[in-house]
UniProtKB/Swiss-Prot annotation:
Protein name in the entry: LIMR family protein SELMODRAFT_432208
Keyword terms of this UniProt record: Coiled coil, Membrane, Transmembrane, Transmembrane helix
GO CC list: membrane
Organism whose genome encodes this protein: Selaginella moellendorffii (Spikemoss)
Cellular location(s): Membrane
Residues annotated as transmembrane: 30-50, 67-87, 129-149, 156-176, 179-199, 288-308, 330-350
Length: 410
């Protein structure tokens, strides 16, 4: 898709013939189609396929995943249809102004800033009317400066019909992601830097002997056998049809203990025999550095939210102005800084998911580790991190077959 997009954009350059622009592929529509297919069909199918019981055959897992995808698609279509039928359109009134005419004059002193058009008897000028259309949890402002328009005022009724477009569908997809982004991102902005700093603080500070290593490994083996026994007991309960609240609670507890056991095994291997390796020491130093940098980024994001988003009107543009100034300094400095701040938000979402819980609705949250990350975790991060709001209104058409409502502005 990316090479095709670049090739189609370059086909409209000045050194090519004009007809090339008309023969290009509709890349914008193709990107929309790929995005919708991935978020509605491909990613949910992959999540349900890998989340299904591993003891089932591939055919059974495919059927189970397809069944869940069909259910999800049905709910999605019903939600889309109901919302479009209820809030798929919006009507509002506006004032139309037109100017009178007069013979050509040589003295333009009567036309000034206070009277920028020809005023007829019985009409008065007004300015700065703001029309607002509310749709799908978003507000779209339309600013009309009427100081340069003219004087004949009449009330007319305009009906704005919002056509069903792919951007409406994309907006529906991103609502869930936006909610998860706010929830996990807020938690992750605190847990991400602090977890890195505490990992450095709790690092292995000395190399243990072989006798100590054998003793610790024996204790870990006992814990492993206890977890295995508990897991076999849960499997017997599952086969017996016991899947109540207590069963799910015990499963979650076993999963958490398994994660803790894996962390302890990794820490033991770092203390012996890898404790003296240079990479191990540098790895923890890198965690400390990134933790401090992440803490600074979290504080900056918090300040930006306070001074630019919570205060109405915004007290100061802050990060917006910083990125603009850095971009004027030279090169891609502003763009690179902006990318770092955005990427940090994505990492905060992932960290928030890891610390907030082991299960989200019907999906399990698996830890992300080097050479130990399960496929469903990647798919869940794609959905939870892709929280970019989309405009629900792509195009509009006008009609006048609905009754007018009273003019809402003085």
């Amino acid at each position: 898709m990316l090479p095709a997009d670049v090739a189609n954009r370059h086909s409209c350059e000045k050194n090519l013939y004009v007809g090339a622009c008309k023969l290009t592929l509709p890349m914008k529509q193709l990107w929309w189609a790929v995005y919708i297919i991935d978020t509605v069909l491909v990613i949910p199918f992959a999540i349900f396929f890998y989340e299904s019981d591993q003891e089932k055959t591939v055919t059974q897992r495919v059927k189970n995943a397809l069944l869940w995808v069909v259910i999800l698609l049905t709910v999605f279509c019903l939600l889309l249809g109901i919302l479009y039928a209820v809030i798929g359109y919006a009507d509002f009134t506006m004032r139309s102004l037109s100017s009178t005419t007069m013979a050509f004059i040589n003295d333009f002193s009567s036309l000034n800033a206070k009277a920028s058009c020809l005023v007829s008897a019985g009409f008065s000028l007004f300015s700065n009317v703001t029309l607002m259309v509310s749709l799908f949890f978003y507000i779209f402002p339309f600013f009309i400066d009427l100081t340069t328009l003219c004087d004949s005022v009449q009330l007319i009724c305009l009906d704005l019909w919002l056509k069903l477009s792919v951007t409406y569908v994309i907006t529906l997809n991103t609502i869930i992601g936006s909610i998860l982004f706010m929830m996990f991102g807020g938690v992750g902005m605190a847990t991400l830097p602090l977890s890195l700093i505490f990992a450095f603080k709790n690092r292995p500070k000395c190399v243990i002997t072989r006798a100590q290593y054998v003793k610790e490994a024996t204790d870990l083996a006992k814990r492993s056998n206890e977890l295995k026994t508990a897991t076999l007991g849960l499997q017997r309960e599952e086969r017996g049809g016991k899947k109540g609240r207590m069963f799910r609670k015990n499963v979650k507890k076993v999963q958490q203990e398994l994660v803790f056991l894996e962390d302890d095994v990794e820490a033991l291997n770092e203390a012996f025999p890898q404790g003296e390796k240079t990479l191990t020491v540098l790895f923890y130093l890198a965690k400390l550095v990134f933790g401090i940098v992440g803490l600074a980024l979290s504080i900056i994001w918090l300040l930006h939210i306070i001074v630019f988003m919570l205060v109405n009107p915004p007290a100061f543009p802050f990060l917006n102005q910083v990125f603009i100034q850095l971009d004027t300094v030279g090169g891609l400095l502003g763009t690179t800084t902006f990318a770092i701040f955005c990427y940090y938000l994505v990492m905060s979402v992932i960290s928030g998911k890891m610390h907030l819980g082991m299960r989200l609705l019907f999906l399990s949250i698996h830890p992300m580790k080097y050479q130990g990350t399960l496929d469903p975790m990647w798919h869940e991060n794609v959905i939870a991190s892709g929280a970019q709001p989309s405009s629900a209104m792509d195009s509009s058409s006008w009609s006048a077959d609905r009754p007018c409502r009273p003019w809402p502005w003085p």
